[in-house]
Amino acid sequence: MKIVEVKHPLVKHKLGLMRENDISTKRFRELASEVGSLLTYVATADLETEKVTIEGWNGPVEIEQIKGKKITVVPILRAGLGMMEGVLENVPSARISVVGVYRDEETLKPVPYFQKLVSNIDERMALVVDPMLATGGSMIATIDLLKKAGCKSIKVLVLVAAPEGIKALEAAHPDVELYTASIDQGLNEHGYIIPGLGDAGDKIFGTK
């Protein structure tokens, strides 16, 4: 599995600000979007382009544009919505697919409860976004759904990832690509990432 830890200074700085315990909902939400945008820039670097001719200000001009069906952004509800705006800043024409998976806080197992995927997902690259890759269960369940629907190209974008989650994801889906702003220390006894960001969903939606 391709694993990319994006170590750009802007990513490091913004993620560092997100780790503050008393960060406001507004600021956390803004930073989640900004880091999501930067991760998207890196993750889409290998998109194929094609040359086309358009009418420029001084006559015909040859340009490059992304080839074929492009991208579907797949936020995992609910926290993934916090990164979606930043992703769409880079790929505004992307279609949106939504998957709902929550983690049972006692068993730590993923529980799928909703999915609404674009009809031609088999022709698109999926960018799956979720702030945290902890145990990997929710991400694996989401990718299971995408592959069942025919999706062949999948990239995962997360703000922070635990080694345990990376290992589980690689074992289940070695053909996907992972882009993260940080590979953190690991999980505590409750399955939360250390040092992590706390409960990203609560911080994004102001329910902490």
Swiss-Prot record:
Keywords: Allosteric enzyme, Glycosyltransferase, GTP-binding, Magnesium, Nucleotide-binding, Transferase. One of its GO terms (molecular function) is uracil phosphoribosyltransferase activity. 5-phospho-alpha-D-ribose 1-diphosphate binds at R78, R103, D130, P131, M132, L133, A134, T135, G136, G137, S138, D199. InterPro entries: PRibTrfase_dom, PRTase-like, Upp_B, UPRTase/APRTase, Ura_phspho_trans. GO terms for biological process: UMP salvage; uracil salvage. Its EC number is 2.4.2.9. CDD domains: PRTases_typeI (cd06223). Allosterically activated by GTP. Binds 1 Mg(2+) ion per subunit. The magnesium is bound as Mg-PRPP. Belongs to the UPRTase family. Catalyzes the conversion of uracil and 5-phospho-alpha-D-ribose 1-diphosphate (PRPP) to UMP and diphosphate. HAMAP family: Upp_B. This is Uracil phosphoribosyltransferase.
